[in-house]
């Protein structure tokens, strides 16, 4: 069982127990967050949202914050001896997917990934 969720403009394919790095959140480590924009629930009977699946949500536990890889920006002006080298490291929040809930009545869904194919 997997789900496609949307969080602040990014889409993620998530499964239960998976660790995921999302854009920085103002949340304490150990707290639970809810990803409500579920676009698709995959499994034996996939459900596609229009645009979201009604009543579906993904609950995740915040593990902490991390920094991404450094991006180096180098600017220069040709023939003028002007050079500037700066770097940037984006901060992310690492979360662990606790459960995928399909219906609003808190029905917890479990399932295996056997027999499913990756469309990518």
From Swiss-Prot:
GO molecular function, one term: rRNA binding
Keyword tRNA-binding: no
PROSITE patterns named among the record's database cross-references: RIBOSOMAL_L21
GO cellular component, one term: cytoplasm
Swiss-Prot/TrEMBL GO biological process terms: translation
Keywords: Ribonucleoprotein, Ribosomal protein, RNA-binding, rRNA-binding
Purpose: This protein binds to 23S rRNA in the presence of protein L20.
Protein family (similarity comment): Belongs to the bacterial ribosomal protein bL21 family.
Oligomeric and partner information: Part of the 50S ribosomal subunit. Contacts protein L20.
The protein's name: Large ribosomal subunit protein bL21
Organism, as annotated: Roseiflexus sp. (strain RS-1)
